[in-house]
Amino acid sequence: MAMKRIFCLFALICFTVIITRAQTPQDSARWNPDEVIAFAQYDTLTLEMDCYFPNDDAEQHRCIIFSYGGGFVDNNQRQVSIRHFCRRLADDGFVVVASNYRLGLQGVRFKGPLRMIKPLENAIGMASEDLMKVTRYVLDYASELTVDPQQIILVGSSAGAIISLQCDYERCNRTDLALRYLPEGFRYAGVIAFSGAIFTRKGMKYTHDRPAPTLFFHGTADKLVTYKKFKLFNIGFYGSDAIVRQFKARHYPHKIIRFQDESHIVSIRYLANYEEVRWFIDKMVVDAHHYEIDETFFDPFRPKTQWDTIGPGEMY
């Protein structure tokens, strides 16, 4: 089922209050993780995952692995809004794992798109490997974590959205990276990407397996993570618009919400779009409805923010 709807928002004051409250919650000890587990060691660097558990006695739960954003430069794993988001999901019955990963672009200076290809590829590769290590840890200790191994959902923001999409892409293409960490026949139950993209040197195609049902959020004017694509011969960085074209052509289940003329600020709206996240999980993951939905959200009164002008040159 293909649907395309255009929404206009006129209640500017109400919208601003809701967004502000959703994105800047007051800190609370209740939002701290229930358990912190080390899952990887690189020399002096220890990577940890923060676990949030539901307050019930069920033996199995659906699991969400959340990957933070930060341009592969900053560690925002325990940012207040992320802890709030994770705790809210746990309160709704999910085991939530907020994962850390290596930051491959720390210290890298931006010298133009072409010179960033290799550093970006390395950063995505390292972080994707770490996310797969987290996945494997959750699978290996599913019983102890009370996780249903067939119900693992990836959720990511910005850089975290990139590696969430990348991991499922690697799985679908049975790459060496995926075969090294993911067991044969494993499939993510779903992917949710707030301003994500996929990197490939072989042109974008799903060669072996179907991608998991995927929910995309992306601003059409995003200057940090491309909304469309950056391509040089077979090397490409494919944003949500380009990925969805592939999904549509092959009728893979998906939903995309395009934020017309909006920037990378969309990447931090996981709390503001919580109901959309829950709808996707309930309808397209749990109930396994096959939807192909394309929505455009347009706010003619949207206030300008610093995200509107930030590009790679200001980030690196």
Q: For the regions a protein language model found, what residue spans apply to each?
A:
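Short beta-strand element of the alpha/beta-hydrolase
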Residues: 60-71
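Cap/lid segment of the alpha/beta-hydrolase catalytic domain
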Residues: 76-77, 100-125
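C-terminal catalytic histidine-bearing segment of alpha/beta-hydrolase fold enzymes
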Residues: 248-316
